[in-house]
Amino acid sequence: MSSREITILKIQEPTRSIASLTRIMEEELSQYRKTLPKGFREEVDCDEDTVLFLHVDFLPLDFQKTTELLLTGKKNLVPVVAIDLQGQILMQAFGNEESQTLSLKTGYAHYFSRSRNQLWKKGDTSGHTQKILQILSPTDRSFLVYQVEQEVAACHEGYYSCFFRERMEGVTWKLLPVPRNFLPEKS
């Protein structure tokens, strides 16, 4: 089994505000869960490489508006969380210097695909663009948040948000009330 790094977001309930973002190895996830307060909920994105842990005791981070490039992290890749105007978390991806520059210049979200090793504009092929309303960063500048106006859906599986299911006890999934705005074509 190949090891991969996953993104963990702690989210304060009921506001769904971001409390922290960290990266861990996938095999550390089980141990990480043991450090969380009782009664947490777990939402997982479509690719199972980002996990939201939700709990009332998590304290939200303070964010500030930014127009500066953030160049930290491995290979100068910075985690980027896309949220809508209501604060709903839509997706998590990565940005490099070029994607951040294009996002600032064009007003539309651009990211860097680690698997394809290339720059991409969200919605370039689907038309499901993300118009940037503002770019935020926590005071420690460890990641970025793009607050966006999402066209149709953020998720390639047709859901408005990539976080459309909750992991229940064990490996059971519960679909969340996230609108499915289209059915992807079978290739």
Curated annotation (Swiss-Prot):
Entry keywords, A to Z: Amino-acid biosynthesis, Cytoplasm, Histidine biosynthesis, Hydrolase
Gene Ontology CC, one term: cytoplasm
A biological process term (GO) from this entry: L-histidine biosynthetic process
Coarse class of the protein's main subcellular location: cytoplasm
GO molecular function (one): phosphoribosyl-AMP cyclohydrolase activity
Catalysed conversion reaction: 1-(5-phospho-beta-D-ribosyl)-5'-AMP + H2O = 1-(5-phospho-beta-D-ribosyl)-5-[(5-phospho-beta-D-ribosylamino)methylideneamino]imidazole-4-carboxamide
Subunit (UniProt): Homodimer.
Descriptive protein name: Phosphoribosyl-AMP cyclohydrolase
Native source species: Leptospira interrogans serogroup Icterohaemorrhagiae serovar Lai (strain 56601)
Lineage: Bacteria, Pseudomonadati, Spirochaetota, Spirochaetia, Leptospirales
Annotated gene: hisI
